[in-house]
């Protein structure tokens, strides 16, 4: 039979959600965008109209309590990843959380315990782990087609000098290392 579509709720109106994830979701046969929550209600209404999302919330709490949502996408600022992912799972939702899933290693145990106690998946959204180009590169390395790895040098950068940008505030975004430094680290471990 036909697979049931996963009904998604989006927490916030982050750029990654607006420009990458939500467009991908509306083009997928297995997903349905059913709700968005943003503290900026004007932005939520705009995105609701743009992506044909029927429910608009101005409180994250209301979205995660919606019984018509199966899974939540969490692209909130980094310091909010753990608390809102846990709250969503405790409300019976699976969670796809943007990277880094936490700002402290000690928070990972709490995420794992929440998964075990709720039976809901909490997964970190990391393009490196799922993109076909990286799978191809990994298989070429595994098959010995491009030699043996002896050392890895990685660099990932962008120009962002706006002091108001969350990526530049170590207290809420973790600073450059947690925001983009994770890419070369995760890629080498992949």
State each model region's role.
Residues 1-51:
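N-terminal Rossmann-like dinucleotide-binding module
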Residues 20, 46, 59-62, 71, ...:
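Alpha-helical elements of Rossmann-like donor-binding domains used by nucleotide-donor carbohydrate transfer enzymes
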Residues 30, 52, 68, 145-148:
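Glycine-centered tight turns that cap/initiate beta-strands
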Residues 31-35, 70-72, 174-175:
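Short active-site oxyanion
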Residues 51-114:
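Beta-loop-alpha module in the N-terminal Rossmann-like domain of NAD(P)-dependent dehydrogenases
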Residues 109-127, 148-152:
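Rossmann-fold dehydrogenase core element
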Residues 128-190:
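Predominantly a Rossmann-like dinucleotide-binding segment in NAD(P)-dependent oxidoreductases
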């Amino acid at each position: 039979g036909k697979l049931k579509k996963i009904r998604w709720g989006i927490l916030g109106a982050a750029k990654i959600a607006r420009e990458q994830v939500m467009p991908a979701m509306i083009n997928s046969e297995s997903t349905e965008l059913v709700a968005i929550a943003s503290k900026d209600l004007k932005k939520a209404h705009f995105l609701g109209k743009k992506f044909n999302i029927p429910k608009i919330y101005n409180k994250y709490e209301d979205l995660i309590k919606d019984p018509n949502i199966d899974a939540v996408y969490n692209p909130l600022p980094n310091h909010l990843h753990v608390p809102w992912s846990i709250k969503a799972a405790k409300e019976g939702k699976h969670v796809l959380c943007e990277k880094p899933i936490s700002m402290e290693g000690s928070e990972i145990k709490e995420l794992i315990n929440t998964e075990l106690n709720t039976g809901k998946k909490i997964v970190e959204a990391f393009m490196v782990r799922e993109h076909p180009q990286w799978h191809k590169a990994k298989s070429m390395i595994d098959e010995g087609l491009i030699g043996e790895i002896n050392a890895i040098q990685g660099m990932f950068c962008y120009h962002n000098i706006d002091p108001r940008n969350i990526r530049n505030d170590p207290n809420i975004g973790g600073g450059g290392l947690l925001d983009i430094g994770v890419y070369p680290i995760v890629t080498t471990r992949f």
